[in-house]
């Protein structure tokens, strides 16, 4: 299958640069994957499309302020780190720019010297392995010095760090937010529970690989990035109970979808499990775990539009995206939402 089959024209002004004041007031497109029928609504009305006995599966990862701006210890030259993956207590895999300044053995200073980094090695994808030196708790140092690593297509500075977190974010570890969850407020989640819909939490720490473009023209040749997930025994049992009783499993976001499809058996039952997943879902994939998906509007030719095309049908998705552009829906991380059922 060709990457170009997932291309669509997107005017730049439709790329949302900041979140709406009221999370749940974003627009909602409802796509029936069997008929291709489309409805338009507001996210806070999502309860109209849910039924008692359904189960929403949400990703409770928390974004860390993983972007660090510092300077080279000897020359003072500016450097930017983005933390990707913790290897041990003080060692991380990072992205760095400009890369030419980050040679093995070089050291960098952040803040007023509260954090110092030494380059230990390079990685296959052009990143670096670094060791950090600091006093106290690393997370506290990072919270003081780091910035939210918002996606490259967002040019505005984020005024409030909390707006790039879901209201239920709990476990730190992501370099990007699971953005479908940004539309939920505490009040809306409570309303959903009151109507007899379960909310179950799993964890997948989102990596920056989620923004990595597909460079291969034949998409089957694309190498997917790895992300760490945790599905607890309690979460697996709750989801499996819904499956047994005939309710629908609705994944909130592509990250929840990736996780559930990774841990599901052939009958769609979920196993308690943790580990790394590099699952790549594109048209032709047979879904085992989910009956519905809540998701944002994704980049042309991205792995995410390929995943939603696998779930709803490529023709349905490309037509829905064409309508979304015509109706001026807001796209990407801070944009509007789609419910596929």
Swiss-Prot record:
Subcellular location per UniProt equals: Cytoplasm
* Top EC category: transferase
Under the cellular component aspect of Gene Ontology, which terms does the record hold? Answer: cytoplasm
Work out whether the entry's keyword set contains NAD: no
EC number(s) from the headed UniProt entry: 2.4.99.17
Catalytic reaction equation(s): 7-aminomethyl-7-carbaguanosine(34) in tRNA + S-adenosyl-L-methionine = epoxyqueuosine(34) in tRNA + adenine + L-methionine + 2 H(+)
Q: Which keywords does this chain's UniProt record carry? A: Cytoplasm, Queuosine biosynthesis, S-adenosyl-L-methionine, Transferase
Q: Which InterPro entries is this protein grouped with?
A: QueA, QueA_dom1, QueA_dom2, QueA_sf
| GO process terms (BP) | queuosine biosynthetic process; tRNA wobble guanine modification
| Superkingdom of the organism of origin | Bacteria
Q: Identify the pathway.
A: tRNA modification; tRNA-queuosine biosynthesis
State whether keyword Zinc applies: no
Which GO molecular function annotation, any one, does this entry have? S-adenosylmethionine:tRNA ribosyltransferase-isomerase activity
Quick one: where is this thing mainly located?
A: cytoplasm
Indicate the family of this protein: Belongs to the QueA family.
Q: What is the role of this chain?
A: Transfers and isomerizes the ribose moiety from AdoMet to the 7-aminomethyl group of 7-deazaguanine (preQ1-tRNA) to give epoxyqueuosine (oQ-tRNA).
Self-association and partners: Monomer.
- This protein's name: S-adenosylmethionine:tRNA ribosyltransferase-isomerase
Corresponding gene?
queA
